[in-house]
């Protein structure tokens, strides 16, 4: 399995870091060498760290924890939403709003506003308003859905946060660290691993690389979620007997 996975990682370019002049020295332990002035990531170190991260995330799901997937740059946005939905978890795939974790009380108020607008759009309230009022509410609804749609049913802070590109999502990492929420992240050679509890060294820019990571995670976590769900159903049936 690991040999096949390593071959797939090489095909996807997971081992390609950034040009050497952009490197972060803190990533030195995970670098294999240099080719054409580009750092090459040591996949023999990436693989076990990726496995460790997968196992810990599976434990989170097994014990009813909530995982927040974060990837707001264009190359990660669609895949981040897809993996979260595949395992019934949560996501932020557009702009990270400052205080999204550390100011959860205010964020929750915005989520309630979003849900209220959704209800209004379905219960006939919009039919009683002027076209201008409807347009304004639809614009606000779309804006809130765009920024909060992936966490509107989270119901509280997550138990873990998974990030694509630590440099890009440094605010999310800082907030998670402040609250003691474990951080899992793909970390490239130009980024700092500081604040990341579960480091996965790898290319965090190429779409093929990002998709490979997230597809594997999706398979593993959705399977875990399905098994947990089936276990709950079985327990309930046994109670009824």
Curated annotation (Swiss-Prot):
Alphabetical keyword list: Ribonucleoprotein, Ribosomal protein
UniProt xrefs under InterPro entries: Ribosomal_uS2, Ribosomal_uS2_bac/mit/plastid, Ribosomal_uS2_CS, Ribosomal_uS2_flav_dom_sf
PROSITE patterns: RIBOSOMAL_S2_1, RIBOSOMAL_S2_2
GO biological process: translation
GO MF annotation, one: structural constituent of ribosome
This protein's GO CC annotations: cytosolic small ribosomal subunit
Annotated Pfam families: Ribosomal_S2
Family stated for the protein in its record: Belongs to the universal ribosomal protein uS2 family.
Protein name, per record: Small ribosomal subunit protein uS2
């Amino acid at each position: 399995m690991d040999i096949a996975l390593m071959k797939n990682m090489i095909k996807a370019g997971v081992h390609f870091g950034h040009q050497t002049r952009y490197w972060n020295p803190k990533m030195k332990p995970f670098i294999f060498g240099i080719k054409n002035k580009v750092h090459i990531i040591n996949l023999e170190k990436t693989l076990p760290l990726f496995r460790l991260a997968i196992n810990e995330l599976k434990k989170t799901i097994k014990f009813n924890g909530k995982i927040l997937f974060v990837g707001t740059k264009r190359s990660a946005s669609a895949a981040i939403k897809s993996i979260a939905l595949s395992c019934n978890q949560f996501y932020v795939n557009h702009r990270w709003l400052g205080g999204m974790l550390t100011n959860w009380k205010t964020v929750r108020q915005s989520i309630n506003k979003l849900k209220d607008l959704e209800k209004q759009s379905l219960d006939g309230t919009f039919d009683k308003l002027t076209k201008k009022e409807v347009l304004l509410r639809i614009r606000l609804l779309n804006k809130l859905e765009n920024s909060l749609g992936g966490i509107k049913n989270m119901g509280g802070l997550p138990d873990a946060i998974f990030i694509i590109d630590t440099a890009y999502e440094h605010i999310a990492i800082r907030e998670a660290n402040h609250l003691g929420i474990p951080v899992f992240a793909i970390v490239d050679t130009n980024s700092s691993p500081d604040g990341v509890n579960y480091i996965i060294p790898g290319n965090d820019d190429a779409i093929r690389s990002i998709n490979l990571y997230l597809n594997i995670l999706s398979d593993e976590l959705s399977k875990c979620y399905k098994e947990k769900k089936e276990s709950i159903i079985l327990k309930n049936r046994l109670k009824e007997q």
